[in-house]
Regions:
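Nucleotide-activated chemistry modules centered on ATP-dependent adenylation/adenylyltransferase
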Residues: 1-238
């Protein structure tokens, strides 16, 4: 692996993907040539983040990178997801992309799943944030010039008053002790509106707050919960 190794960045629109992209490039782990995102085909929004497709397009434009979109039905089963991703990864492999980067931090099962999926098409994974202290990562986000706001919270962990908060040292001081500072367990999700690798900041306007409840697919209620989403817009793409 060198500076010219072609890498696809799995892009969620949030801070972890942005920081992983920043570190990957800065540390010479490879060259990001594509962004890859999964979207709800019903709503044209990023899964769980709730970010509009137009905002994703704006991020990609600011990064001057092509954005590959995998659109999936609501609550896709594993087979549908795997088939869609394998088609996309196979196409990237044919274009000379040999690595896929992720913003995962400590979820072992997810990392193994991704690596097994990549191995099927002869690709490998890069995890620039892996096993790093999440409080340190929040400080690194702020220190590196990445600017992000919270756009989704799991109501089991955070109240809707956290929506719109910036990810910075002030947030770090206010986050409850049972919440991972990076939201690695799905406690919250973010949107990046500025980064060192953006050509310019993305102006955003906040809209309504929406509450949605999701049921555990197997009906055992083990993760039934509600989420608050902050709708955001870019005036440039209204």
């Amino acid at each position: 692996m060198n500076n010219n190794t072609k890498v696809v960045m799995n892009w969620s629109s949030g801070k972890d993907a942005a920081l992983a992209c920043h570190l990957l490039t800065g540390q010479g782990m490879g060259k990001v040539t594509h962004l890859l995102t999964t979207l709800s085909e019903e709503h044209d929004r990023v899964f769980m983040h709730g970010v509009r497709e137009k905002l994703l397009d704006t991020q990609a434009e600011r990064m001057r990178l092509p954005l590959l979109k995998v659109k999936l039905p609501a609550s896709p089963d594993d087979t549908i997801y795997k088939e869609a991703m394998l088609r996309t990864l196979t196409g990237l492999k044919k274009e000379g992309v040999s690595m896929a980067a992720y913003g995962d931090i400590f979820l072992e099962d997810l990392k193994v799943y991704r690596e097994q999926q990549l191995a099927q098409v002869g690709m490998a994974g890069i995890f620039p944030l892996w096993k790093k202290d999440t409080r340190d990562l929040v400080r690194l986000v702020e220190g590196s010039g990445i600017e992000a706001i919270i756009v989704c919270v799991n109501e089991k962990y955070l109240g809707k008053e956290f929506l719109g908060k910036k990810i910075n040292s002030e947030f770090l001081d206010s986050v409850p002790g049972n919440v991972d500072p990076c939201g690695e367990n799905g406690e919250f999700h973010t949107f990046v509106y500025n980064a060192p690798f953006f050509s310019s900041p993305i102006p955003i306007v906040t809209g309504e707050i929406v509450h949605k409840t999701y049921k555990s697919p197997d009906g055992d209620n083990k993760w039934d919960t509600g989420f608050y989403f902050l709708d955001i817009f870019c005036p440039e793409r209204a």
